[in-house]
Amino acid sequence: MNSLVATPPVPPHFYEHSRFSSPHPMSNPIHTPSSRKRKADDDGNDHDGRMSASPTNSPAFTPRSLPTPRSFKRSRPNVFGRPLSLPRLLETLDTDALRGILRSMCERHPALADEVIHTSPRPSVTSALQVLRNYQTALQNSFPLGGNPESDYAYNRVRQPLGNLLDALSDFTPHFLPPNESQASVSLSYLDGATEIIHALPRWNSPQNNIERDSAYDEICKAWVLVIREAAKRGGGIQLQYGGWDQKLSKHNHNSGGRLQAAVNELGNSLGWMHGPDSQGYSSPAAGDLGSIRDQLLSGTYGLGTPVKVGPW
């Protein structure tokens, strides 16, 4: 009777519990596919585990943070008024303003004037003549429009700029004369340009107004004589011979109305022995022979036409 009574079925979770909690595992377990459905949580955990796992020989990954943009802030001084520095101030001054400032400083400090004189470069012939031409331009621009430019009225109108030109001429001329100027070519070049400026001085109807012009010719003539004498002492006057100064001085004498005749005579006396027999009274035939020999020596043709004796003397 008892064998026919059916035993109640055991719930499945009892089997699961007994399988996982068995103290004696089987020596040869048989892997069978589990019929239990996998949950989504299990899949996520397995995926995270596989992704987080890394080989033992791979370098560790260290996260890097992106550089944050740096902000540069330039410090600005407080805005307030201040005077210009000396270099910037000098940049704003023109030539006339600089001359005025330098002149006033030299007048107040004589020691500074000596330093400026020794520090400044030596004026050249070009720069000196340019200054004289600037005064000449100012003189020409001072003439009144219309009327007689040779009248006393015109003379009174241009008297001040005329005096400025003559004063500048008197100051610059001694600078280019010996012994202050040792190069005869420099002195002659200046005198040539200065004489041209004197030729351009206006002529007046009144003789008394022409006294200043005549005095300028007398001073420049004395300067010509001094330079010619010094140039004749150096190198046999070669600067006078090959510079064409005899022709230039003759032209200046003609334009001045004969007021440079003393300089022309001095040049003739200094170069008389260098000219040939066809010179304008500068030399004798003997001096012409000396000049011919000198020309042959300078050209390298001396003695080429002389016959050479062969055999016993």
From Swiss-Prot:
Residues 20-33 have a biased composition (Polar residues). Disulfide bonds: none annotated. Its main location: cytoplasm. GO terms for biological process: nuclear protein quality control by the ubiquitin-proteasome system; proteasome localization; protein transport. InterPro entries: Cut8/Sts1_fam, Cut8/Sts1_sf. GO terms for molecular function: proteasome binding. PANTHER family: FI02826P. Involved in ubiquitin-mediated protein degradation. Regulatory factor in the ubiquitin/proteasome pathway that controls the turnover of proteasome substrates. Targets proteasomes to the nucleus and facilitates the degradation of nuclear proteins. Binds the proteasome. This is Tethering factor for nuclear proteasome sts1. The gene is sts1.
